[in-house]
Amino acid sequence: MFNIIKNDKNSNARLGILELPHGNVATPCFMPVGTLGVMKALKHDVLEKLGCDLMLANTYHLYLRPGIDVIKKYGNLHNFTTWNKNFLTDSGGFQVFSLSNFRKIEDEGVDFKSHIDGSRHYFTPESVFSMQETFESDIIMALDICSPYGIDYDEASLYTNITTSWARRTLCAYKNRKEGYEGLLFLITQGNFFKDLRKRSTELILELNSPGIAIGGISVGEPRDRYLEILEYNSSLIPKDKPKYVMGIGTPHYILDAIYNGIDIFDCVNPTRIARHGSLLTDNGILRINRAEFCFDTCSVERECSCTLCTRYSRGYLRHLFKSEEALGVMLASEHNIHYMFRLINKTKNAIMNDNFVKFRKLYLDKYDEGNLNE
């Protein structure tokens, strides 16, 4: 199911193989986010050529549109979308709980209003698992409560307890899954930014012995030093034989921090989100193509990059596409940024294989500061 093939000698970084129903996934792995089963501005064949083996889709959004009955008619999410690689489906918990003025949390589940039309809906751990079972997701995420940064201890403790209770119920549903379904369940540790809650949550989740473990509730607006503190602490509590997933991180410096601490999987909308606004990831930092300085620039965005944009088009032409609001500009920039993330991961894998990851990370972080990487 998960095999570690190389441990870095100077950090907790490692190389692994995660065996999933639609093919093996080499870790560390950056997961592009295809919320509705599709990447914004990227066709499946482009993703496949880039080497994507695992895409994230979102249960909350798919539940609302097109609806579970539509996907069931096609047999599963893979058939509906024609994506023949792996899907990880988020439980939708983050989206539901971000609707703070439109939801009510109970021990049984959560009542919420649709962001589309205001209609009321109710999610339980069992119903969310059932939806993902219908999708035949390759990785299923349990329903959890992602509590915001800055809440008090009592509220964080309450949400952590509910998350643990929901994890037990999800595991029970998973053990009674339909015959032949081989997707892997990842349970989620919470605890906000209180170490004793993190420890309690992780210990209780580990007792349930799910195939994989996710660290939730970090990278939610906290300072980077707090992120690093909880990331390192929570990861250290999880046995090394478990695949580890940190949810919602996707900037290069956060990913390198995660890999350093033994994290195997991560996802974020950031690369394609900033691409849609004309910001491109390069080895020299973010290039903002809308700036006037690029109007007459005949160079490619990045010389060493082999994506469609960099092998064919100039910076000046890409700027023209964005200024003219041509869809091709967004498509090219999105492909470039995803390709960049995959290239970064491949460089990271080579560094781990050669026990050179610590040096590689330091050189990268010395070159890129946090402000330079955020839009």
From Swiss-Prot:
E.C. designation(s): 2.4.2.29
**Which catalysed reactions does the entry list for this protein?**
7-aminomethyl-7-carbaguanine + guanosine(34) in tRNA = 7-aminomethyl-7-carbaguanosine(34) in tRNA + guanine
Q: State which pathway it belongs to.
A: tRNA modification; tRNA-queuosine biosynthesis
Q: Where is this region: RNA binding?
A: 248-254, 272-276
Q: Write out the residues that bind Zn(2+).
A: C305, C307, C310, H336
- Binding-site residues, substrate: D90, S91, G92, G93, F94, D144, Q190, G217
Query: What's a single GO CC term here?
Result: cytosol
A single Pfam family it belongs to is TGT
How the cofactor is bound: the record states: Binds 1 zinc ion per subunit.
Broad EC category: transferase
Query: What cofactor is this protein dependent on?
Result: Zn(2+)
* GO MF annotations, alphabetized: metal ion binding; tRNA-guanosine(34) queuine transglycosylase activity
What GO biological process terms are annotated to this protein in UniProt? queuosine biosynthetic process; tRNA wobble guanine modification; tRNA-guanine transglycosylation
Print the keywords alphabetically. Glycosyltransferase, Metal-binding, Queuosine biosynthesis, Transferase, tRNA processing, Zinc
PANTHER family cross-referenced by the UniProt entry: QUEUINE TRNA-RIBOSYLTRANSFERASE (PTHR46499:SF1)
In the record, the note on similarity to other proteins reads: Belongs to the queuine tRNA-ribosyltransferase family.
Q: Return the protein name.
A: Queuine tRNA-ribosyltransferase
Query: Which organism is the protein's source?
Result: Borrelia recurrentis (strain A1)
